[in-house]
């Protein structure tokens, strides 16, 4: 017999009855029913009920056991008594009558229980992550994550992609966020950077004559805490292809992502034949570049119905050409209570309020806006929005560039409050035609909107003749249920176009050479047209596991202060280590 087990805790069935077995695992739960001890023994594979009564030679040892002790149990498999089967367990028809117990690892008093799924403070869960990971839901999420990554790999290889590994120590580059820097001992005063993404390396692979690259790549960004991103590191399905158009990339990747979602959707519908939505249309209809298409609400520009109207607040705004009035339809929301609730919500979001019109059963409009603009305009708005009696519409006005984010939040809020969002669906879409540049209000200059290596639509001619803020890029995102889950683009593979693109964003040619020297040199020796994308592994897993917290699908995450409470990172290092790296600390004054 094996030293520790003949079977796992998830293996025993009716066919094993009367067999002598050996199991090892953790004491998940111990119950005393009238002097009979029931030990639920758990391992990675499942749970088995073990029974010790006073006649068992191991009863005295069983009485000493406590939760989460690691034990070896020998015993005989028997049928559970009639009426005590547990249909929720694969092993629920049998139990093990205990004949011998060996304690392999006793456990101290638990700072959080493993049995049950009680909510515990995050700092406790992260400090004792090894206990937290024993809990069923989190443990299963981590296993699902591994299966999803396996599925991604398999599907990428079926599409003809080959997996590569790119360096972790690289050069610092301006890709949007701060780099994590690693000091060089051999080169005093110089630093490596952990890659924010394998962007340059994967493009260099295309210039090296390879094709169809992919990698499950760790990425590192020293960013301030955000609700939708873990501090420190994240993983992406990184992809690059040579001699391709945007449509070629869509054709290769849409089946991969669709297939992964279908495999793990647990019965939810998955979009087939993804819609392609232009960035400008997405912002106008949904108020965001990552629309949740489960929500059927589409916003409309209804400025013409308020221009010159009796509602002077909007009418005066519309005298300025840049201002508009957008409507957010609210099907079924035509009650004063709901409209007042939305108005209060808007005020809580820092807005002066949220104008509304509701249509009563007779079809007439009601509310302050309807009273001011009159029945003819009110009816025209209802017709334009396709609304009926019992519906409502909410309105935002001003400069769209300033109110669009709030309008998107309002659309989501209306959809949630009116139960319009289809929770049994993964709604996937491409968002295309992103602007190449945007105006940076902080630095008062034109800057890259997204990836600086993207090809501008119109190429060199667009860079030299168009207003930069009107140039679109061959750049695209994949969105799902309100999350951006992938981003990519066709690359700017001509060196003169690359230099010009960076020049518009305020980078001189020498700075481009200094920062991207390897790739810039490679461009001089025959660079193929190429493009790719990167899909966020963490966000995809989060969606498929049905959680909204990335920590629920990550093994050892940091907290929102970028601290690893289990390992004690970041930590101080010894003076000797600092001297070897030629580093002298200049700490901020904490007084």
Curated annotation (Swiss-Prot):
Q: Where does ATP bind?
A: 221-223, 484, 536-539
Organism domain of life = Bacteria
- Catalytic reaction equation(s): tRNA(Asx) + L-aspartate + ATP = L-aspartyl-tRNA(Asx) + AMP + diphosphate
The annotated region (Aspartate) lies at 199-202
Keyword set for this entry? Aminoacyl-tRNA synthetase, ATP-binding, Cytoplasm, Ligase, Nucleotide-binding, Protein biosynthesis
For the keyword Lipid biosynthesis, the answer is no
Fetch the InterPro entries from UniProt: Aa-tRNA-synt_II, aa-tRNA-synth_II, aa-tRNA-synth_II/BPL/LPL, Asp-tRNA-ligase_1, Asp-tRNA-ligase_1_N, Asp/Asn-tRNA-synth_IIb, AspRS_core, GAD-like_sf
Q: Which residues bind L-aspartate?
A: 175, 221, 450, 491
Tell me which positions the record assigns to the signal sequence.
none
Provide the Gene Ontology terms for cellular component: cytoplasm
Keyword Lipid metabolism in annotation: no
- The EC number of this protein is 6.1.1.23
In its UniProt record, a GO molecular function of this protein is:
nucleic acid binding
Q: Where in the cell is it found?
A: Cytoplasm
Transmembrane region(s): none
Per UniProt, the enzyme's principal EC class comes to ligase
Q: Which GO terms describe its biological process?
A: aspartyl-tRNA aminoacylation
Q: Show which residues form the site (Important for tRNA non-discrimination).
A: 33, 83
Can you state the subunit structure given in the record?
Homodimer.
Protein's job: Aspartyl-tRNA synthetase with relaxed tRNA specificity since it is able to aspartylate not only its cognate tRNA(Asp) but also tRNA(Asn). Reaction proceeds in two steps: L-aspartate is first activated by ATP to form Asp-AMP and then transferred to the acceptor end of tRNA(Asp/Asn).
Hey, which family's this protein in?
Belongs to the class-II aminoacyl-tRNA synthetase family. Type 1 subfamily.
The record's annotation in HAMAP family points to: Asp_tRNA_synth_type1
Stored NCBIfam families? aspS_bact, PRK00476.1
Q: What is this protein called?
A: Aspartate--tRNA(Asp/Asn) ligase
User: Organism source for this protein?
Assistant: Rhodopseudomonas palustris (strain TIE-1)
């Amino acid at each position: 017999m094996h030293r520790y087990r003949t079977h796992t805790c998830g293996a025993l069935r009716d066919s094993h009855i009367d067999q002598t077995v050996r199991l090892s695992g953790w004491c998940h739960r111990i119950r005393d029913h009238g002097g009979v001890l029931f030990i639920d023994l758990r391992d990675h594979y499942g749970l088995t009920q073990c029974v010790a009564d006073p006649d068992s030679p191991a009863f005295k040892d069983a009485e000493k056991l406590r939760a989460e002790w690691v034990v070896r149990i020998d015993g005989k498999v028997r049928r559970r008594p009639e009426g005590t089967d547990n249909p929720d367990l694969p092993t629920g028809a049998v139990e093990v009558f205990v004949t011998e117990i060996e304690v392999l690892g006793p456990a101290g008093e638990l700072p959080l229980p493993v049995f049950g799924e009680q909510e515990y403070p995050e700092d406790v869960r992260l400090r004792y992550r090894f206990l937290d990971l024993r809990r069923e839901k989190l443990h299963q999420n981590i296993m699902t994550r591994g299966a999803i990554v396996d599925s991604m790999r398999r599907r990428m290889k079926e599409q003809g992609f080959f997996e590569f590994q790119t360096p972790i120590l690289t050069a610092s580059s301006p890709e949007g966020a701060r780099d994590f820097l690693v000091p060089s001992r051999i080169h005093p005063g110089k630093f490596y950077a952990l890659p924010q993404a394998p962007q340059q390396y994967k493009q260099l692979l295309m210039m090296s004559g390879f094709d169809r690259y992919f990698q499950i790549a760790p990425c590192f960004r020293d960013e301030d805490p955000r609700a939708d991103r873990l501090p420190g590191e994240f993983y992406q399905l990184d992809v690059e292809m040579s001699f391709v158009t945007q449509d070629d990339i869509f054709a290769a990747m849409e089946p991969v992502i669709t297939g992964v979602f279908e495999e793990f959707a647990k019965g939810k519908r998955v979009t087939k034949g993804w819609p392609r939505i232009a960035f400008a249309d997405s912002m106008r209809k949904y108020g965001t570049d990552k629309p949740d298409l489960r929500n059927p609400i589409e916003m409309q520009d209804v400025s013409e119905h308020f221009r010159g109207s009796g509602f002077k607040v909007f009418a005066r705004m519309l005298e300025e050409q840049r201002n508009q009035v957008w409507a957010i339809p609210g099907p079924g929301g035509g009650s004063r209570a709901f409209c007042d609730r939305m108005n209060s919500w808007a005020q809580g979001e820092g807005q002066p309020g949220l104008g509304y019109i509701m249509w009563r059963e007779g079809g007439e409009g009601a509310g302050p806006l309807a009273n001011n603009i009159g029945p003819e305009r009110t009816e025209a708005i209802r017709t334009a929005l396709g609304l009926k009696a019992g519906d409502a519409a909410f309105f935002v006005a001003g400069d769209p560039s300033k109110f669009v984010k709030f309008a998107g939040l309002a659309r989501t809020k209306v959809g949630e409050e009116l139960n319009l969002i289809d929770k049994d669906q993964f709604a996937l879409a491409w968002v295309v035609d992103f602007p190449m540049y945007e105006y940076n209000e902080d630095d008062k200059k034109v800057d890259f909107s997204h990836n600086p290596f993207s090809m501008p639509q119109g190429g060199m001619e667009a860079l030299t003749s168009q207003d930069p803020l009107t140039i679109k890029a061959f750049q695209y995102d994949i969105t799902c249920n309100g999350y951006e889950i992938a981003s990519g683009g066709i690359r700017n593979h001509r060196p003169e176009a690359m230099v010009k693109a960076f020049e518009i964003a305020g980078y001189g040619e020498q700075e481009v050479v200094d920062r991207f020297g390897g790739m810039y040199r490679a461009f001089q020796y025959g660079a193929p047209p190429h493009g790719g994308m990167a899909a966020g592994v963490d966000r995809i897993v989060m969606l498929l596991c049905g959680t909204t917290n990335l920590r629920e699908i990550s093994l050892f995450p940091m907290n929102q202060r970028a601290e690893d409470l289990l390992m004690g990172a970041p930590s101080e290092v010894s003076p000797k280590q600092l001297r070897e790296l030629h580093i002298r600390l200049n700490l901020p004054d904490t007084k």
